[in-house]
Amino acid sequence: MNTGSSACSIDWKKVKGAILTEHGVKLPADITGEKLLELCHADRPGRIYPILPFLEYAKNGGEPQVNAVGYGASEYNGLSAQTDTFTLKKFDEVLNAQLLKCANKGWDVYFWNQDNMLIGYNDDTDILAGIPMSTVYPTVTQYPTSSAKSAMTVSFSHEDVEDSQLHFDYVQLDFNPKNFVKGLVDVVFQKLEAENTYKIVEVVGGYDRTEEFGSLIADGAADVMNNVTSATYSDGIITIVPKAGAVPSLKAPSVLYEKGIRGIEQVA
């Protein structure tokens, strides 16, 4: 054991966001903002899932368990389970539904703070890993009250909090992740009454995104859509020329990303 402190003492600032990855999936050592955005659109299991912004933090658990046996001396017996809870800016109905859907799933999680420190887990390799979490889940107040707006928190339960602390590590970034990361939203390629006409609509709430992406999709139709030879865009409607007998659909987000179509994924 040694009790010295780092020659570069850190004044730890507030955590501002998190990045979820599948267990064992790491951010690359030479990470850049552009690479983070690309990874948000990557094919699974290599995709990353950002959650932000965090406004407040509360710790639950993670306390030393010290007990005596009979009249013997007190002895350390580990740390109690710990959950880190962060308050978001507002209730987000889409994020809430997605987190609930995956609440029984474990993740590796990176955090970043105000000083752009990327916080993670030292797994004895040259590349920082995410902190293993047994579950990540939301808690919401969906509707405003007389004294407060609707609200949402996201909680991260450590798989082994003592192990998390023993292997705590970080790297300094030269950019702010919040300026680059972008979580994806589920959309449908919705068929309209007129033949071969479509819109891009968000699954939850039905918000129409066609105006935002219509021209890009039409310009690269054969590259960004399955079973389509060409397309045009006009007045909020995408008109396609489909391949015979085939159902048109958007390609994977990794393909859309290369054509400048970002932040969406078509679901069945």
Predicted segments, located by residue:
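Beta-strand-rich structural segments
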Residues: K191-E212
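Beta-strand-rich domain onsets/edges
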Residues: L173-T197
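The feature marks long extracellular or luminal low-complexity segments
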Residues: T210-A268
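Solvent-exposed edge beta-strands and adjacent loop segments
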Residues: M1-T83, A129-S147
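Extended Gly/Ser/Thr-rich low-complexity repeat segments
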Residues: L99-Y110, Q172-P177, V247-G260
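Short beta-strand and beta-hairpin "edge-sheet" elements
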Residues: E56-P64, W112-D163, V267
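Short, acidic/charged, Gly/Pro-enriched secondary-structure junctions
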Residues: K89-L128
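Oligomerization/assembly interface segments of phage tail-like spikes and tubes
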Residues: P64-N96, S147-S164
